[in-house]
Amino acid sequence: MSHDARARLSDLRRTFHRHPEPGWREFQTTARVVEELERIGVDEIAVGREALATDARMAVPDDDEIQPWLDRARRAGVSDDLLERTAGGHTGVVATLSQGEGPCIGLRVDLDAISIHESEERDHRPEAEGFRSEHDGYMHACGHDAHLAIALGTLEAVKQSAFEGTLKVLFQPAEEISGGGKAMAESGHLDGVDYLFALHVGLDHPTGEIVAGVESPLAMAHLTATFEGASAHAGKAPNEGANAMQAAAVAIQNAYGIARHRDGATRVNVGRIEGGSASNVIAEEVTIDAEVRGETTALMTYARTELERILYAAAELHDCDVTPHVISESPCVDSHPALQEVVGNVAWGVDGVEHVIPSEEFGVSEDGTYLMQQVQDAGGLASYVLVGTDHPTSHHTPTFDIDEESLAIGVNILSETFVELSRRRP
């Protein structure tokens, strides 16, 4: 890859890094992706509602949370036409490049950022070199800025290559809240896709190390549950109330006692509780946010069913009502060995690659599995590839950063894999 091409990848990544946006509010990010696609020159660009199955969106925020981000994008110069197409939380893009007869290959990457205040320390490179987040309280702390740069670089490299076939790049919104994968999977854009790839940078793999395909991403469900009781004076007549706080506390304690399953690992966590009004008032309403995970989709469903049973039992014990609601979820889908082999063989020939791991357990959750499942259920193959990158601190921390040398490695591996698949089917 030329020096100019490497520099462009770095510039792209830094542009995305400066303008992080949370799930379903990635208006500037969507606009920048479209701008770059138009520069590259692709055959089709589907934006917003054209890129999604609207009714399948999950964890969509309220309008009053979306509107400030749309207004910010308008002030930044995003066109009224694009904002109209993405308004109401309909971000996302699908680009299609057609280059003759051959396989249809999909590449999925994610658009959104995380609610973290980025470090202002001088030894934090984005601060030192002038590309720290300009959106206070939000940051690309998981590498999605790198994913976007790699995807756009791959698309341009494939266009300039001997690739024969169709390449679809799916820029998915709302990965961090597991909200966009299902909507993009059911959009129709995966119809006819033979091979689908997703990618992630880092995850404790250094620059030059590649994982050709992950196994066992944990299936996951986010839930919220609101306990409704009756308020009363906590000193004079506590017996006249129905204590929603006590019901929630019982539910939380018992959630961690869900029996382990013989078929594999499960996880449960209650990460947030909110409710009540004063120490002398029996709490009338309390809301908790929880999640369950499982080594398989069936195990996640088991944990979710058990958690819901506990919620209802705790509510009944304290004469309360409870309304659990699944906000978002994602399945467990493994990478296909045939694609792992192709990626691994290609990676060994890419400049900068020092170590190739055929497969490893993922250990976290990822709603890109919806897209993988959609393709595999239709008879195609899918793989989730890890591109190593040196990062000074862990993902989801204020000082997270990447080694930009890994961008070119990611582009070269993916583009050369796609060319190889257009020549020889596994």
Where are these regions (language model features)?
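Acidic/His- and Gly-rich active-site-bordering loop/insert found
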Residues: 2-139, 160-163
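Divalent metal-coordination and catalytic microenvironments
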Residues: 16, 37, 95, 107, ...
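Histidine-centered active-site/metal-ligand motif
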Residues: 17-19, 24, 140, 144-147, ...
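Short, small-residue-rich loop/turn micro-motifs
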Residues: 49, 109-111, 200, 221-231, ...
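Histidine/acidic-residue-rich, glycine-tolerant segments that coordinate divalent metal ions
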Residues: 58-59, 93, 115-116, 127-139, ...
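Short glycine-enriched loops at secondary-structure junctions
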Residues: 110-113, 120, 202, 218-220, ...
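Metal-dependent amide/peptide-bond hydrolase catalytic core
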Residues: 246-426
